[in-house]
Amino acid sequence: MGRILYKYLDIDGAKCMIGNHNLQFTNASQLNDPFDCHPKLLDYSDVPKHKLQGWIPEEWWIEKEENDALNLRNDTWLCSLSKVNDSILMWAHYCYNHNGVCIGLDIDNVMESVPPMFGEIYLQPFVLDVQYKSIIERPDGYCNTIGLFNYQWQTKAKEWEYEQEVRLVIPRPSAMYAALTPAQAKHPKETWDWREIHHYMQLKGECFESIYFGVNIDEQEKDKIIQFVRKKLNPHINFYQMRVDADAFRLQPEVVKPLNSDLSHG
């Protein structure tokens, strides 16, 4: 088994992900943190001397490089995962007051599921552990390395550290993997900004390693998910019910034992 990372979702998002066997990527400009992947994370003020030997002024170079960084942000889609499945805050924020689901994904299997030409520049997403900073360090933006791009993609404020985020990052994903969300599809005449369009990567059943149900999960929804997953997605998946620990401010997973009707489909 490879590294397991977790996706926190409300019940509708979980059913979409499980039912469609896919992973949703969101444009970097559309995230809930305005600092995310922002061009100002990098410093373009110290223009290298060799760029100033011609007639082009320093201000032009600074504006150009900042625009390039902005375009990189607008051309990048990512999927946010977590190293942990028991964050009380994430269960509250992303699973609508612990009513949702946390899905464990085997990242080795996920990377093996990447479809052909998912990205126009890179064939596979980058897997980046988010780095949390107390200050904006603003490294030199003229160091033309992939590490510099990674800094823009993976740097967040210290306040977000509880999320223990790992990102799958794909610059310029192929348009063939773009699709409207169910909510967007309800408004077929609406004109959407291209950055509002999500991209979806199909997953094999073995990518789904575990499913954790929130403390306040609706029991009927829970049963529907278990039956669907065991019959049509991955019969070997592990199910857990999150419980409140009576002795500490933490959540404890409890194994969901299969019913006899479940075993008959194994």
Residue ranges and their predicted role:
Residues 1-266:
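Partner-binding and oligomerization surfaces adjacent to conserved cores of proteins
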